[in-house]
Design a protein with these regions (language model features):
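Conserved small-residue
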Residues: 14-490
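N-terminal secretory signal peptides and thylakoid transit peptides that target proteins
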Residues: 1-14
Length: 490
């Protein structure tokens, strides 16, 4: 069996892990919106803020379809941060991709009554121009790449397919080495049931678009399978073909891979290729090729593909050395885990890989009734979003199913090498009731951007009576999820 040392031998050494976030031995159970020492938090954008240049001001008490289609969506999942084309003024800029997977009517609408058409406008995805001025990252008002994708966005099906309506339930995404953006409709099936007139067969896809051209038509790449992938990551094979990894977040979900027939540089490279499913066995992984005309899941299971748990998030080393995978319901551990997949010969299109546990979640002790909130170990529970920071750390965001957990959701940094490998450092604690909704690294900057998803949520919470009114804490104003920038120097 190939050893980990042999697999990486001869490769350029990865940067040593840097303790960018400050470690913490424990945190109080009810800490709320707290960056670690030395980290500055700035709010970038929030639910209802303008994305389209002509969107009206946010009016939470009067939800409106036309307004919602031009405003930042209700739910938040940071997907990718891409360097903007360089200009001569030297101002750091980036394009931020954010998904809006779901919408809870009780928290989004004043009377708690669902308004499916407006809800369909509040979900989907947003592309945001950001820039750094005066040491602070800001949204660029009227930025060229700013756009909203929602239930009425015109799309097309890949291959010989025709037009398609809408982008639905975006739970994951990734920038590709060939310059496009991939989005996953992980909650697409739920929106197909919720919205009238939506064809179920046109949901649940991986969607590809040009993030730098606001008029580009999103394409649903049917060749990658239709199973509502939870997340996606993209790489180049050693021979230049496109490689796309997909995490199927269903119970018993599999890890998938698509390898294009032709070079990734071809405009429709993702329309022709081979779909694979992973078989895990004794610290190793083997890819199983699937026939093009079969049901992918049935064919995969029949050929021996298996699951380590529920795959929910991916992070890919751009140098091709490793893929990190977050799992829910890891065997014998309900708190989940993160595993590291090391490609043979550093080729993501290779047939085999080594699999190693990087970190397992820990379930915190329950608080005792009537007692003051105690300190509990600052350790990830239910890892749900991943990002490699380029400095030797894996960023891990948590999203626990129960909103009354003893431990708040948070962002952690895990070194990948050295003596501290797999030991988490706490970077940011989300507001009360919120989950950590994805994380990305701004290219060329010592800044992370993280999503704050559904703040104020919890048992019995509603629009008029949330658990928190983050971020402004104004009477009568609902909590508003959004994106924060986390930078050194706070």
């Amino acid at each position: 069996m190939i050893t980990r040392r042999a697999l990486l031998a001869g490769a350029a050494a990865l940067p040593a892990a840097r303790a960018w976030a400050q470690g913490a031995p424990g945190i109080a159970q009810r800490l709320d919106d707290a960056p670690a020492a030395g980290i500055k938090r700035d709010l970038l954008i929030q639910w209802g803020d303008r994305v389209a240049y002509d969107a009206p001001p946010f009016a939470a008490l009067a939800p409106n379809l036309a307004a919602a289609e031009g405003q930042f969506g209700w739910d938040t999942r940071v997907l990718a941060a891409m360097a903007s084309p360089r200009v001569e003024d030297g101002i750091p800029r980036a394009v931020l991709a954010v998904g809006h997977p779901t919408l809870d009517p009780a928290m989004a609408f004043p009377d708690g009554r669902d308004r499916p058409e407006i809800a369909g406008a509040m979900q989907g995805a947003s592309l945001i121009n950001i820039q750094r001025r005066g040491g602070v990252w800001l949204v660029t008002e009227g930025g060229f790449q700013m756009r909203r994708l929602h239930a009425r966005t015109l799309c097309r099906m890949g291959g010989a397919g025709g037009p398609a309506r809408g982008v639905f339930g975006i739970t994951g995404g990734a920038a590709t080495p060939w310059g496009s953006l991939l989005l996953t409709e992980g909650e697409g099936a739920a929106w197909a049931r919720r919205l009238p007139g939506v064809e179920a067969a046109q949901t649940g896809h991986v969607v590809e678009l040009d993030p730098f051209e606001p008029q580009s038509v999103p394409v649903k790449r049917a060749a990658l399978g239709r199973f509502g992938a939870r997340d996606v990551a993209a790489a180049l094979a050693a021979d230049g073909r496109a490689v796309v990894f997909m995490a199927d977040g269903r119970d018993g979900g599999l890890l998938w891979r698509f390898v294009s027939d032709g070079p990734a540089a071809e405009p429709n490279a993702l329309d022709q290729g081979t779909l694979y499913a992973a078989r895990f066995e004794a610290g190793a992984l083997r890819w199983i090729a699937l026939p093009a005309d079969a049901d992918p899941y049935g064919a995969a299971v029949a050929r021996g593909a298996n699951s380590l748990g529920r795959p929910v998030a991916l992070a890919l080393d751009p140098n091709g050395a490793r893929l990190c995978l977050a799992l829910r319901e890891f065997p014998r551990n309900p708190a989940g885990a993160v595993v590291e997949i090391l490609f043979a010969a550093r080729d993501p299109a290779g047939d085999t890989a080594i699999v190693e546990n990087l970190m397992e979640g820990r379930v915190p002790p329950r608080p005792r009734p009537g007692r003051e909130p105690a300190l509990v170990p600052a350790w990830p529970v239910a890892p749900s979003s991943l990002c490699l920071d380029g400095q030797g750390n894996l960023l891990v965001g948590t999203a626990q199913p129960a909103r009354d957990s003893a431990l708040p959701d948070a962002l952690y940094a895990l070194p990948l090498e050295g003596r501290a490998r797999g030991e988490p450092s706490l970077a940011y604690i989300t507001p009360l009731g919120a989950a950590l909704g994805g994380v990305a690294v701004v290219p060329g900057a010592a800044t992370w951007v993280a999503g704050v998803a559904h703040p104020g949520a919890g048992m019995g919470a509603q629009f008029a009576a949330p658990r928190s009114r983050w971020p402004h804490f104004r009477d009568g104003e609902p909590p508003r999820g959004g994106v924060v920038a986390l930078s050194r120097g706070g």
